[in-house]
Amino acid sequence: KMTMIVGFISTLLSMLAGDMSAKFLHKVQPEKLAAYEWHFDTQSQANLVFFGVLNEKTNEVSGAIEIPGMLSFLADNSLKTTVKGLNDFPKNELPPLIVHYFFDLMVSMGVFCFVISGIFMLILLIKKLRHLTTHKVVLYSILLTGPASMLAIEFGWFLTEMGRQPWIVRGYLRVSQAATQAGGITLVTILFGLLYLVLIVTSAYVLLRMFRNKPAINDVNQVLKERGDNK
């Protein structure tokens, strides 16, 4: 219950942060915002683009879901706001356009968490539906919000780091100029990867051993029984 309440509030705050981020990028890093949305031509009433496939030769997007004027609205709270397109920036200063896919994935994971936590909140508010809190579909959906939220964070990180390319400090220092030449970096990276792999496998094994044939609902019922709560 507490997890879903906190999750619902957190997703709302994340949406607010996303709105603020769009406005910041519109003013400070417009090429980054344009890359996120595959926005090529400078115009007002710019559409917000979800999903789709880009033809990089023609800059045409197919199979996308577009919300008319929403990119302009996110940029400055007005459908008439002019959003600068990728065609108006030097090509050697543009981020890789793959960032759009990370944007889609981040938003999808965030929306999933918002919908599940919102449904759970609705179930709590309506007495006739409260018995659904222990329904398998609800419990499995809640379980999926854990990895979904982590994936949203990771995709957001990819989005941010790749979106600022080719700059370390925008307009002053490129990544190619700041990249370290120190030896041993490859070895350290491999060792860290192996360490995390061992931790993942070990953690999964321990958790499976702990909870196999021991459903959490049994522990919950035992606690309720000890408290004398039969509801």
Residues of each region from the PLM?
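Membrane-helix cytosolic exit motif
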Residues: 17, 21, 198-216
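Short, highly charged, low-complexity non-transmembrane loops/tails of multi-pass membrane proteins
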Residues: 31-37, 214-230
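Hydrophobic alpha-helical transmembrane segments
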Residues: 105-122, 195-203
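Individual transmembrane alpha-helix segments
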Residues: 55-111
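C-terminal TM-helix exit segments that contain a strictly Trp-centered aromatic cap at the helix terminus
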Residues: 10-22, 79, 151-164
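Juxtamembrane interface at the cytosolic side of transmembrane helices
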Residues: 1, 114-154, 208-219
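Aromatic-rich transmembrane-lumenal/periplasmic boundary elements in polytopic membrane proteins
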Residues: 6-75
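Membrane-proximal extracellular juxtamembrane segment immediately upstream
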Residues: 145-191, 195
